[in-house]
Amino acid sequence: MRSPESSVSREPDARRGCKLDALAAVTQAVPQSVLPSSAPRWAHRWIIGRGVDLTFVIGSALAGYAYLVANVALHVPISLLWWFWSVGFDGTHIFGMASRTFFDAEARQRNRTLLFGSAAFFFALGPALILIGGKAVLAMIVAVWAYYHVIRQHYGFMVLYKVKNRDLAKTDSFLDRWFLGVMTVFPPFHRFFIHHPEELGLKFSFARMEPFFWVLVAATVVVYTGRQVLRIRRGDPINVPKFLLFAGVIPLHWLTFAYMSWMGAVPTVTIVHNLQYHALIWFHNRNRYRVGDHGLVPKAVSRSLLNYVLVALVFSALYRVPGFHLGQASDLAFGFFCGFGLTHYYLDSKIWRVRSDPGLRQALQMA
């Protein structure tokens, strides 16, 4: 039997416990909005490293701005800018893709049907379209797919930054995807399908629907901005690399298609893509080909940046220079050489699937 003293001494503790429980319940019931907002936290984990990301993944946009200024303000001939970009950056980035597919012995063995089947199909598609009078259709396929390929890569880097910085809320993922898509698709659509369809040889436009498209753009900006304000007020982490990527590429696309026709726009927006791709390929190859027997080319170009640059330039020149001259002389040759780009666009949509490829996750240090 407990003494009266022990009962009395424990009673206040019990009452205090009840009061604390009640206070906790009331505190948890207070709506979050009436609490003071937390200071935003800065999230800045990088894909490759701070310096490389800021220089080549995000800072690559500066190369696009340099092209814009060189052509529009300084009147450097677009033909000169085109050749410098085509051989120096675009053809070389296709070599980058080939270095981890066709030149990789393990990849050739594992994905033989994908690699050689797609190459056979796309190198035959161009000449087939030419033979049935579809050169304009082929040119449109190449142009639209090439631009989609560029913005899809920006999206891919955005996703990598989201994964790295745990920015994975479903609402934000949807809004990020929608915002980037609208803000990069609208500029060329506005130029070529509303105001200057003649630059693509089109006989129709969507000029009457222009107000609707501007409302769509404005609504996208308002909703996206509102979401970011809400996140800041809640004290959610701010994904710094993601927003730096947006700040680099989105204004570039708007300025490019405001001032340049397709001839100038192609190298201006694509050189950014090329530099990003080279940085990612170099990072991937250095990690993947350090050990194992993957073939002579991957081993050689992954050990020395100079080797990578020289081999890529030779590869690019060997098909870009004759491809241009033969394409001028023969439509069939033009169709055939389109196969390089089309095969690249297709394979690139297959070989960078981080979720389903453990080896890729390891090479990109995403595990």
Where are these regions (language model features)?
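Short, hydrophobic transmembrane alpha-helix segments
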Residues: A66-L80, F324
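Structural signature of hydrophobic alpha-helical transmembrane segments
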Residues: I78-G91, A139-Y147, R208-A218
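N-terminal membrane topogenic signal
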Residues: P40-G59
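Central hydrophobic cores of alpha-helical transmembrane segments in multi-pass inner-membrane proteins
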Residues: W82-T101, V150-H154
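Extracellular/periplasmic helix-loop-helix junctions in multi-pass membrane proteins
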Residues: Y259-A265, L318-G335
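Membrane-interface helix-loop-helix junctions at boundaries between adjacent transmembrane segments
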Residues: E106, R110, A128-E210
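Membrane-interface helix-boundary motifs at transmembrane edges
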Residues: F102-T113, K162-S173, V229-P241, V291-P298
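Loop-centered beta-sheet repeat module
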Residues: T184-L245
